[in-house]
Amino acid sequence: MQPTADQFTEKGWAAIVLAQQLAQQRKHQQLETEHLLLSLLQQNALAGRILEKAGVSIGNLQTAVEAHLQEQPTMQAAPDSVYLGKGVNDLLDQAEKHKQAFGDSFISIEHLLLALAGDNRCGRKLLNQAGVDAGKLKVAIDAVRGNQKVTDQNPEGTYESLEKYGRDLSAAAREGKLDPVIGRDDEIRRTIQILSRRTKNNPVLIGEPGVGKTAIVEGLAQRIVNGDVPAALQNRQLITLDMGALIAGAKYRGEFEERLKAVLKEVTASEGQIVLFIDEIHTVVGAGATGGAMDASNLLKPMLARGELRCIGATTLDEHRQHIEKDPALERRFQQVLVDQPTVQDTISILRGLKERYEVHHGVRIADNALVAAAVLSSRYIADRFLPDKAIDLMDESAARLKMEITSKPEEIDEIDRKIVQLEMEKLSLGRESDSVSKERLEKLERELAELAEQQSALNAQWQQEKGAIDDLSSLKEEIERVQLQVEQAKRSYDLNKAAELEYGTLAGLQKQLSEKETALAQDGEAGDKSLLREEVTEDDIADVIAKWTGIPVAKLVQSEMEKLLGLEAELHQRVIGQEQAVQAVADAIQRSRAGLSDPNRPIASFLFLGPTGVGKTELSKALASQLFDSEAALVRIDMSEYMEKHSVSRLIGAPPGYVGYEAGGQLTEAVRRRPYAVILFDEVEKAHQDVFNVMLQILDDGRVTDGQGRTVDFTNTVLILTSNIGSQSILDLGGDDSQYREMERRVHDALHAHFRPEFLNRLDETIIFHSLRREELRQIVALQVNRLRERLCDRKLGLEISDTAADWLANAGYDPVYGARPLKRAIQRELETPIAKSILAGLYGDSQIVHVDVDVDQERLSFR
């Protein structure tokens, strides 16, 4: 027959074209069967799969074909075209007959292979030498093709569909590749119950991301392998479908549907032996539906309803609502299994079950208190994720961090290495000097270097020894895990002799070795010097990782931090002059929180600062942020004068769905989601619209609020400070006189109750009245402001000395009880900073000069020299 492209599949025709090219490259006049065989071996993955299934070594067969081609006569130059040899013509006729026998529409790779197995020229001989005949080849082809027919020019995509587009969870469970599943018995039992139904036997696991939906299916796979399931599920194969692989590369319309149909056909043909698992099942809705093609869900529906296909789905609550509930016909074919977040206690049990796997992987030990800390701390401080996923991640990252420390050079050795390099450089420099002082220093250096080298050698030996001991433990744990898997496999295959031999012989011996090594390592740690390496993850490691993730300091207080917290009040007083009550209240709240005594379901503290302008309300907030986070940038400042309209509430928590800006989120909620540990300042709160306070009620009482997108934002690690000028006139009129303090306080509270609702005021921890500033306090503020100016002048290499009389003069010039410290700031700018700036620009001050400031009594202004 004269071959044409429309008689062959795409891959079949490509094999013939490549065979022609191979004949030309080798300067052969005729295209023969050996060229076609080499073409199939070189290019075609399907031919290779079939031959490997038949037990052929592809490399050896290719070498044999190459050797046969070397023996063929060649031309002096490559021919322009090659002719079909008689052998190829006969082979193509045979391939046509095989096509008809299979009931196919096109000649494909498998027909060409079968024809080669009957080729009298060389194909049969070469294949027989490789250990395969037509019979074996037919069996291998049936195994690869299954029940598929060649009905188009690209049928290879439908062969071995499950192998290509799925992952066998049962095989993974048999090989011990799946993590153990702890608990979740109710959900697994309900899943088995639904799978055992006659029709609509399709459970869908619905739950928040990270609660363990996929783990439930893995647990089911382990139960099937262990035979711990009803008869309806005994010896079933659980395969997870990879929707990404199914869609990837499906270029032409209808190609995706063909692949999916092939998968479903294989599942149906298994007559219930295969259970399909589709993770993220919402992706089947609309998948592949381009250019008017049917989507995957419409292909699944008929089979799901008839019970021909057992399918387990998994998706989140939101995705289920958005995609699957919109298609009631698909939704009714699945039976819902709701998967709730486990409790902290259940999470601890899950972590204990997984602990061994993570210990073996990282080569470290994980203390039980670390597991408890991972569950408890993640539940408390990581609000936007779910247990057990966030607790497992914590444990994993803490173990990875410790492993990194073990494999890195210890700090003690690194310091000595750096010191040796530094001294070696100094030694080289001194070696060039000939004076007696340099020689003496050189001798001293050499002695120091010798001591350091000795220390380095001892520490390196200790490090290698400790590292070796930890590596030995890790290897033993890996070996124990491997033997445990062999024991399980032997028990499953009822090889009880082997199981007993491994369990009571090999495994018992390994566990004894492990126990001895762990005891020896612990004793060395207690008896010997300080260890360079730690090999156990503790609760402190977990706390450090949480702090890195969220910025919330949850680690145990070290001595330096305790001292810092005890001195917090004094530190705040250095920046905020006067206002004893306010500073003490703020410091007390922070100390309660860091000691772990504050209510975990409310913000750390919430204050309302009242007082006239310029007395330090905002400054105290900045000072607190600076003390807690070493930066004023950690202060989330919200100017409430921007929230005077009713609709501006949406700016705080985010616009509702359907409004412009819905995706952007709220200014307050987004700031706290990114930085959960913060000082939040609501400045001039009386200017906000009353509806803004409705949002704040929830924050003040429960420490949480729901943003425009329905996410819960946690405020339990924030300090809320609200400032207001309400009642400031009463404070100014009566605040200076101690005898009238009670009257002033009463008037301020009356003004407060007139403006704010009782339920808002009742939720605040404390309402603090800031007094108007006295002259002596202004004098201290002058000293503060002058120190700040001195620091700025230091950058220009200038000093500043100001006399007491000049400081008093500035305090008087800036004194205004109505406006607080702000007029003082303006007076310092006008009388002190501006003249100094002009003198610098005029070149009157050089480097390292000191600017002396005094008072010119005659002209009533400051003098500079």
UniProtKB/Swiss-Prot annotation:
Domain notes: The Clp repeat (R) domain probably functions as a substrate-discriminating domain, recruiting aggregated proteins to the ClpB hexamer and/or stabilizing bound proteins. The NBD2 domain is responsible for oligomerization, whereas the NBD1 domain stabilizes the hexamer probably in an ATP-dependent manner. The movement of the coiled-coil domain is essential for ClpB ability to rescue proteins from an aggregated state, probably by pulling apart large aggregated proteins, which are bound between the coiled-coils motifs of adjacent ClpB subunits in the functional hexamer.
C-terminal: annotated span: 773-865
Protein name: Chaperone protein ClpB
Annotated Clp R domain residues: 5-147
Region Repeat 2, residue ranges: 84-147
Function: Part of a stress-induced multi-chaperone system, it is involved in the recovery of the cell from heat-induced damage, in cooperation with DnaK, DnaJ and GrpE. Acts before DnaK, in the processing of protein aggregates. Protein binding stimulates the ATPase activity; ATP hydrolysis unfolds the denatured protein aggregates, which probably helps expose new hydrophobic binding sites on the surface of ClpB-bound aggregates, contributing to the solubilization and refolding of denatured protein aggregates by DnaK.
NCBIfam families linked: chaperone_ClpB
NBD1: annotated span: 160-341
Keywords, comma-separated and alphabetical: ATP-binding, Chaperone, Coiled coil, Cytoplasm, Nucleotide-binding, Repeat, Stress response
GO cellular component terms, A-Z: cytoplasm
Subunit structure as annotated in this protein's UniProt entry: Homohexamer. The oligomerization is ATP-dependent.
GO molecular function: ATP binding; ATP hydrolysis activity
